Structures are given as C-alpha cells and as structure tokens.
Amino acid sequence: CELTNITIAVEREECELCITVNATWCSGYCFTRDPVYKYPPVSEVQQTCTFKEVVYETVKIPGCRDHAESLYSYPVATECHCETCDTDSTDCTVRGLGPSYCSFNQ
C-alpha cells in the first residue's frame, strides 16, 4: 500500500471543459484473509489501501462563463495505510466512474 501517481479529469458544469491534473493517491495490497474453517461464524473485516492524510490542491479551469467559479479543489494523498474502508469519504466499490471520466466531449 503506497502512494501512486495518477491523472484525474476535473470539470465544472459552468465551464463546459475538462482538464487533467496529476496527483498522488493510494494503491496496492493489504493483508487480508478468509479462513477455511468458519465455525463458529465470525465476520472478517477486510482492509483496503486508503489515504491516511490528504491535502487539497486547487486549479483554475479555463473557459468559464461570466462570473462562474473557475477554481476547482481536489484531494491529493500524502500518506497511505491499510484500514477498513470509510464509506463517508471513499468510494469503496468498483462502481465509480474512474479518475479520467469527463462529462463533456473533448
């Protein structure tokens, strides 16, 4: 479980444009187990590689309409660890759109 360089697309609806930025995020493996002997039944807590600390960086998205907010802040991981996934701050599934998804045609 370690910091990894990623490229993400950022957008604002008012600007009708996506730009890509480089950031760091957490990626890798965490020790996990699924015991063969399951009696008595005990639920196993799976851990995922997730951020321990983040900072927010801000970029200006060009081409925004009059008086539209053109600044966009995004999280950048500075430290990683293995922990139970916190669904309040993290997409813990594989259902997300992915970091390079953009709503607008480029």
Swiss-Prot record:
What are the disulphide bonds in this sequence? 1-49, 15-64, 18-102, 26-80, 30-82, 85-92
Which GO biological process categories is it annotated with?
estradiol secretion; follicle-stimulating hormone signaling pathway; G protein-coupled receptor signaling pathway; regulation of signaling receptor activity
**GO molecular function list:** follicle-stimulating hormone activity
**InterPro entries in the record:** Cystine-knot_cytokine, Glyco_hormone_CN, Gonadotropin_bsu, Gonadotropin_bsu_CS
Q: Which domain of life is it from?
A: Eukaryota
Key words, A-Z:
Disulfide bond, Glycoprotein, Hormone, Secreted
Q: Where in the cell is it found?
A: Secreted
PROSITE patterns, from UniProt? GLYCO_HORMONE_BETA_1 (PS00261), GLYCO_HORMONE_BETA_2 (PS00689)
Pfam families from the entry? Cys_knot
> Listed GO cellular component terms?
cytoplasm; extracellular space; follicle-stimulating hormone complex
Glycosylation site residues: 5, 22
- What SUPFAM superfamilies has UniProt attached to this entry? Cystine-knot cytokines
Q: What does this protein do?
A: Together with the alpha chain CGA constitutes follitropin, the follicle-stimulating hormone, and provides its biological specificity to the hormone heterodimer. Binds FSHR, a G protein-coupled receptor, on target cells to activate downstream signaling pathways. Follitropin is involved in follicle development and spermatogenesis in reproductive organs.
User: Quaternary state and partners of this protein?
Assistant: Heterodimer. The active follitropin is a heterodimer composed of an alpha chain/CGA shared with other hormones and a unique beta chain/FSHB shown here.
Q: Which family does it belong to?
A: Belongs to the glycoprotein hormones subunit beta family.
Q: What is this protein called?
A: Follitropin subunit beta
The organism that produces this protein has a lineage beginning with: Eukaryota, Metazoa, Chordata, Craniata, Vertebrata
